[in-house]
């Protein structure tokens, strides 16, 4: 299944992506997005964004793709709870601790392995699947042959970044 996935840094770009026919959007949560200097969504803005997208039949994936330190765990837990309350469709993560905490708080929410997890082989895709990820985001440095080998290795969604 193909999916047109668009990055969104603010409501303006989100509205444009939905209007242009995106099937899904991904956006940054205000504290745990790797794009710290970009516009990211507060908890309140996230609720509005998800409501608008779901009304339009568009999925919303939230990036929680920073490396997290112990002192940040309470804030991360609150961010995960806020995203769950907003009814996001998946998290995109790179830190296994974030994946674990997400599973503890909202076990039913799909996890996507960020390109920062560097799943670059069939073995990596198989491991991601075994760890409960539903999708792996493959890096742009992979060849078509490598991508084919990964996609044929196991039943996990693949996304090309």
Regions found by a protein language model. Give the residues of each.
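Non-catalytic helical/linker scaffolds that mediate oligomerization, partner binding
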Residues: 1-161
